[in-house]
Amino acid sequence: MPNLHLVRSLKLHGDRCWSVDISKGLLATGSADRKIKLVDVRNFKLVEELDDTAHKKAVRSVAWRPHCNVLAAGSFDTTVSIWGRDDDDYSGETELLAVIEGHENEVKSVAWSHDGAYLATCSRDKSVWIWEADELSEEFECNSVLQEHSQDVKHIVWHASRLLLASSSYDDTVRIWAEQDDDWECAAVLSGHGGTVWCSDFERAETGIRLCSGSDDTTVRIWRCLTDDADVFDKEWIQETVLPAVHTRAVYSVSWSADGLIASVGSDGVLAVYKEVQAGRWEVVARVDCAHTVYEINVVKWLALDGRVLLVTGGDDGCVNVWELREE
């Protein structure tokens, strides 16, 4: 049975850590203290603290653009900042490239498409915006404004290899979006949770489309699209399973690893890892209670590093904890 071992606890922020993202050896963090910090995952040392005057309120979400040293950060001040680095050796400074405006209320989540062509943002104003980015990450043109959620949109995530976007909302649903005839349209509405859906993540698989979601109702659910076609419109989605009950309070973040494991964290301070032991049947293979002592955990992300299976969590204690999943 695997166990989760705490590798490092980094006290990076003076207020809750909302978001983490990892790319090209750099871990980015965003916090209620308005700060964005960059950490070298090879030694877990702080590389840089970005200019905290860029945002007037909390930084709720950070996301690296694929294949380049560009970071997007969404804030409660309604804006999204874009930052760029010129080097891979972490010696240079990160510069502010652009500030994106458009949302009327707090930006809750930002996410890049797998090819880096699109940046999606969502907000308490109930909308999801899709932006086309130029190669330099300095110009952003609004491609679509999606307004079909009836409440606050909490989180967005792109599929790892398809132009599919999932948005999670206070209206208790997940919506799946895809491009059709040069417009972005809602391809499916996933209903079944009994409370706010805080998060979701797509399976990283070459065939089939599955999504996990976490909710205020304390459950993590798996959804499956009954097609493997590129065209997902007019295709049925089913709730494939509900993962074994672990959480006693809201599930704030889920992450689906490249080798098929799912991690979840939430308001109860629990970090859990699940494995599919046969098609549609999952087991809890590792669990840590009070993973950030008495504090809530807001985010979890998988990190593959030198053959090690690591997890990164961020909590209300301002800490970023790094965990290793080890076979005992």
Curated annotation (Swiss-Prot):
One of its GO terms (cellular component) is cytosolic [4Fe-4S] assembly targeting complex. WD repeats lie at residues 12-49, 54-93, 102-141, 148-187, 192-233, 246-284, 291-328. Signal peptide: none annotated. Keywords: Cytoplasm, Nucleus, Repeat, WD repeat. Its main location: cytoplasm. It is found in: Cytoplasm; Nucleus. One of its GO terms (biological process) is tRNA wobble uridine modification. InterPro entries: CIAO1/Cia1, G-protein_beta_WD-40_rep, WD40/YVTN_repeat-like_dom_sf, WD40_repeat_CS, WD40_repeat_dom_sf, WD40_rpt. Pfam families: WD40. Interacts with NAR1. Belongs to the WD repeat CIA1 family. Essential component of the cytosolic iron-sulfur (Fe/S) protein assembly machinery. Required for the maturation of extramitochondrial Fe/S proteins. This is Probable cytosolic iron-sulfur protein assembly protein 1. The gene is CIA1.
